[in-house]
Amino acid sequence: MIKQLVLAASLAGLAAIATPAAATGKMTCSAPQAKWKSRTALEARLKKQGWQVRKSKVDGGCYEVYGTDPKGNRVEAYFHPVTFEKLLVSRRGQILYRKK
């Protein structure tokens, strides 16, 4: 009986930890790397739009940006590397924007 309670509590804890990651999902972009624009160009464009970029990197073939959006939200955002189209913006596991 005690083993079942411990197992149930452990599984509930794991589910709670995994929820934020599942909420945003994994973004993937499939564009030939030869057509990509530079990350510095994306950062410059975002800064002109009022973003504060702390860090950017490539993740899943997309550009992933960590920073503050123009509304002051500290966010993680994904952009298409060729078009710079905004694909997903999330804050602490909560989706603020997702391209349809």
Q: How should each PLM-predicted stretch be described?
A:
Residues 8-16:
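Bacterial N-terminal signal peptides
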Residues 27-53:
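Short, non-transmembrane alpha-helical segments in secretory-pathway proteins
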Residues 22-24:
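Boundary of Sec targeting at the N-terminus
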Residues 51-58, 63:
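Surface-exposed patches in mature extracellular/periplasmic domains of secreted proteins
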Residues 84-100:
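A short, surface-exposed interaction/processing loop segment used at functional sites
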Residues 18-20:
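N-terminal signal peptide c-region/cleavage motif recognized by signal peptidases
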Residues 1-9:
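Bacterial N-terminal signal peptides that target proteins for export
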Residues 65-68, 79, 84:
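Conserved histidines in hydrophobic membrane contexts and catalytic metal-binding motifs
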